[in-house]
Amino acid sequence: MAAEASESGPALHELMREAEISLLECKVCFEKFGHRQQRRPRNLSCGHVVCLACVAALAHPRTLALECPFCRRACRGCDTSDCLPVLHLIELLGSALRQSPAAHRAAPSAPGALTCHHTFGGWGTLVNPTGLALCPKTGRVVVVHDGRRRVKIFDSGGGCAHQFGEKGDAAQDIRYPVDVTITNDCHVVVTDAGDRSIKVFDFFGQIKLVIGGQFSLPWGVETTPQNGIVVTDAEAGSLHLLDVDFAEGVLRRTERLQAHLCNPRGVAVSWLTGAIAVLEHPLALGTGVCSTRVKVFSSSMQLVGQVDTFGLSLYFPSKITASAVTFDHQGNVIVADTSGPAILCLGKPEEFPVPKPMVTHGLSHPVALTFTKENSLLVLDTASHSIKVYKVDWG
């Protein structure tokens, strides 16, 4: 019995933490719900729940009209009501939640662990974001999302510095952005699944080049150390290298690096070794279930390592569903897992795989990730419409 109790302790703590993140937090401002007036959970007429402070911020000052930030249904601030189930849950879990900070202080993060130091974005600032990139010169963060202007640029502090890329059907507009990368000379490259093209902008949002008619469904995009562009074609099952004169807005050459890939989506390039990682989404025959597979190629495009959902299940008790891939500064392959959700290190390609969890808390649905020059990890969480900045805690 004592053994069962000791085993259930971590599981119970994990359940409490998950409840606190998923149920007891306002998904607009990310503050914890509580009994204080500004933090009280309020039901909107559509059934979604936000805190009273966000209701006040969203409502028109005279008419009190507002739109639900999640489903856009119209309602009025005066028609909201306390969400009693959430308030009751706070009371039921109150003692355990009050003990949680003390428990965290008693067991601090191990030296070298990644901890979330900063979050920016949020619903309204970002809407269903899909791609993330970091400018190598300015350090600014570029995100593509489903807002009226599809490309949003943030400064290092998380403030919105600029946005462009109108939603529309014109050649220079962006219909459905999937991924984004920044070239070494600060050009913004976006894959647009809406018209199956690749669009190149300067850093101020002026269109420089539209590459259309060559891809069935362009998806992942990344910059190489030589300032080339690699792009996956999910429908054609191929990987391409584009040589572009960005200053003149001219496509010089297109080279197909790989064919016969299975629904390739995410792609990453190691600036240390030149290796290329591709994230595939093969469909299991007869099941309709989509798994994921990470393939790593050398700079000469020789396959040096691969691992799929089944292979990772030999290391972890739960299913791993990779949604994004990148390299760290040491050449390790890093993936985002939406089933966990978590961030995992798979090790170096020649040792593939040596999986190790890096981030296991505080994520909802990570879809993109990248490292800064200072070795901070940026994670794009589409469920919370935000960018989360993780740094190494040396204790």
From Swiss-Prot:
GO molecular function, a single term: ubiquitin protein ligase activity
Give positions of the RING-type zinc fingers: 26-72
Q: What is its EC number?
A: 2.3.2.27
Recorded consequence of changing residue 126 to P: In MELF2; the mutant protein targeted exclusively nucleus as compared to predominantly cytoplasmic and partially nuclear localization of the wild-type protein
**Pathway connected to this protein:** Protein modification; protein ubiquitination
The domain of life is Eukaryota
State the tissue distribution.
Answer: Expressed in brain, cerebellum, spinal cord, medulla, heart, liver, skeletal muscle and pancreas.
PROSITE patterns (UniProt xref): NHL, ZF_RING_1, ZF_RING_2
Q: Where in the cell is it found?
A: Endoplasmic reticulum; Nucleus
Outcome of substituting residue 146 to N: In MELF2; severely reduced interaction with EPM2A; increased levels of PPP1R3C and glycogen
Question: Altering residue 261 to P: what's the impact?
Answer: In MELF2; loss of interaction with EPM2A; increased levels of PPP1R3C and glycogen
**Cross-referenced InterPro entries:** 6-blade_b-propeller_TolB-like, NHL_repeat, TRIM-NHL_E3_ligases, Znf_RING, Znf_RING/FYVE/PHD, Znf_RING_CS
Q: Which Pfam families match?
A: zf-RING_5
Q: What is the effect of changing residue 302 to P?
A: In MELF2; loss of interaction with EPM2A
Annotated catalysed reactions = S-ubiquitinyl-[E2 ubiquitin-conjugating enzyme]-L-cysteine + [acceptor protein]-L-lysine = [E2 ubiquitin-conjugating enzyme]-L-cysteine + N(6)-ubiquitinyl-[acceptor protein]-L-lysine
**Main location group:** endoplasmic reticulum
Its GO biological process annotations read: autophagy; glycogen biosynthetic process; positive regulation of protein ubiquitination; proteasome-mediated ubiquitin-dependent protein catabolic process; protein polyubiquitination; regulation of gene expression; regulation of protein localization to plasma membrane; response to endoplasmic reticulum stress
Keyword set, alphabetical order: Autophagy, Disease variant, Endoplasmic reticulum, Epilepsy, Metal-binding, Neurodegeneration, Nucleus, Repeat, Transferase, Ubl conjugation pathway, Zinc, Zinc-finger
Q: Where are the NHL repeats?
A: 113-157, 161-204, 205-245, 248-300, 301-349, 350-393
Where, if anywhere, are coiled coils annotated? none
Q: Which disease is it linked to?
A: Myoclonic epilepsy of Lafora 2: A form of progressive myoclonic epilepsy, a clinically and genetically heterogeneous group of disorders defined by the combination of action and reflex myoclonus, other types of epileptic seizures, and progressive neurodegeneration and neurocognitive impairment. MELF2 is an autosomal recessive, severe form characterized by onset of progressive neurodegeneration between 8 and 18 years of age. Initial features can include headache, myoclonic jerks, generalized seizures, and often visual hallucination.
Q: Give a short account of what the protein does.
A: E3 ubiquitin-protein ligase. Together with the phosphatase EPM2A/laforin, appears to be involved in the clearance of toxic polyglucosan and protein aggregates via multiple pathways. In complex with EPM2A/laforin and HSP70, suppresses the cellular toxicity of misfolded proteins by promoting their degradation through the ubiquitin-proteasome system (UPS). Ubiquitinates the glycogen-targeting protein phosphatase subunits PPP1R3C/PTG and PPP1R3D in a laforin-dependent manner and targets them for proteasome-dependent degradation, thus decreasing glycogen accumulation.
Domain comment in the entry: The RING domain is essential for ubiquitin E3 ligase activity.
Note the PANTHER family from the entry: E3 UBIQUITIN-PROTEIN LIGASE NHLRC1, E3 UBIQUITIN-PROTEIN LIGASE NHLRC1-RELATED
How does the record describe its quaternary structure? Interacts with AGL. Interacts (via the NHL repeats) with EPM2A/laforin. Forms a complex with EPM2A/laforin and HSP70. Interacts with PRDM8.
Q: What is this protein called?
A: E3 ubiquitin-protein ligase NHLRC1
Q: What is the lineage of its organism?
A: Eukaryota, Metazoa, Chordata, Craniata, Vertebrata
